Regions:
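A generic structural signal for short, solvent-exposed coil/turn residues
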Residues: 15-17, 36-38, 96
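Short helix-to-loop capping/linker segments positioned immediately adjacent to catalytic or ligand/cofactor-binding
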Residues: 131, 154-158
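Short low-complexity, flexible loop/linker segments enriched in glycine and/or proline
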Residues: 120-121, 158-161
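Short, solvent-exposed loop/turn segments at secondary-structure junctions
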Residues: 113-114, 150-155
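C-terminal/domain-edge helix-coil "capping" segments
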Residues: 23-58, 133-137, 149, 160-227
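Bacterial N-terminal signal peptides that target proteins for export
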Residues: 1-11
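N-terminal segment of the mature soluble domain
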Residues: 53-146, 175, 179-183, 214-227
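Bacterial N-terminal signal peptides
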Residues: 10-21
Length: 227
C-alpha cells in the first residue's frame, strides 16, 4: 500500500513537471552551438584544460574566455578543485575517443607537445596556445576547455548538505582559420527534485541521487557533446 502511494506521488510530480514546463521557461544550464557532429575532422587534439574566469566574462563567458590572456584568468580556490583541469581533460579525452576514434591524437602525445610550447602568460590566450599546439601536432582541429567551477558535494549520494557544482566552456577551433567552429557551456549546481520540478528530466538522468563533482562533470560533458 505504501509503495503504491509512493508511485502515485511520483506520477503526480512528473505530471506537474510537464504542466509547469508549458507555463514557464526552463533555466538554461547548457548552452551550445549545434552541429558538432557535422564538423569534418581529420586530426584532432584536446588541449589540456585551463582553469579560470575573467571578471568581465562573468556575464558572457562563452564569447570572451577564449581570447582572454592567461595572466588575466583567475578563480576562487574554493570554487575550483585543485586538479579539476587534469580531471576534465581526462574525462573529455575519454568522451572524444568514442566520437573521433582514430582521428583523436593520444593524450600523452598532446601533453608532451603542449609542455614544449613556449608560454608567455601576459600575452598568451587559450586561443593562441591552441593554434600553436595544433600546428605543432599537424592537427586541423583543437578542442579547448576552460573550467571555472568544480565544487565537490558535501554529504553522500542519499543526502547532501551542499551539492556538487560544475561549470566549464568548450571550443572546437579550426587551426587554419584560428576561429571556433563550435562552442558550448555547461553550468550546473545539482538540485533536488523537490526544489525544482522543472529539473525532473536531469534529476532522473543523473540517477535520482546526489552526484560527486566528477560524476556531474562527466554528465555535463555528455550533455554538451551529445554523446
Amino acid at each position: 500500500m505504501i509503495r503504491v502511494q509512493l508511485y502515485r506521488v511520483l506520477y503526480v510530480a512528473i505530471f506537474l513537471t510537464f504542466v509547469l514546463a508549458g507555463c514557464q521557461s526552463k533555466p538554461e544550464t547548457v548552452k551550445a552551438r549545434s552541429g558538432l557532429s557535422a564538423v569534418k575532422v581529420q586530426r584532432i587534439a584536446l588541449m589540456p584544460f585551463v582553469r579560470g574566469l575573467h571578471n568581465s566574462s562573468l556575464g558572457d563567458p562563452m564569447n570572451r574566455l577564449l581570447y582572454c590572456t592567461i595572466s588575466n584568468l583567475c578563480f576562487n580556490i574554493r570554487e575550483v578543485k585543485g586538479n579539476a583541469d587534469e580531471l576534465m581533460t581526462g574525462f573529455l579525452q575519454e568522451a572524444l575517443q568514442k566520437s573521433y576514434a582514430g582521428a583523436l591524437i593520444p593524450d600523452p602525445t598532446v601533453q608532451a607537445a603542449y609542455a614544449e610550447l613556449p608560454k608567455y602568460p601576459a600575452t598568451d590566450t587559450p586561443q593562441s596556445l591552441a593554434i600553436a599546439l595544433g600546428r605543432k601536432l599537424q592537427a586541423d582541429h583543437v578542442m579547448v576547455g576552460i573550467v571555472w567551477r568544480y565544487k565537490e558535494r558535501v554529504g553522500t549520494a542519499e543526502a547532501s548538505a551542499s551539492p556538487a557544482s560544475v561549470a566549464f566552456t568548450l571550443y572546437l577551433l579550426n587551426v587554419a582559420q584560428g576561429t571556433p567552429v563550435w562552442q558550448a557551456t555547461f553550468d550546473k549546481t545539482q538540485q533536488a527534485l523537490s526544489e525544482n520540478l522543472l529539473n525532473a528530466k536531469d534529476f532522473f538522468a543523473m540517477g535520482a541521487r546526489w552526484l560527486t563533482a566528477d560524476e556531474l562533470a562527466r554528465f555535463g560533458i555528455k550533455q554538451v557533446i551529445g554523446e
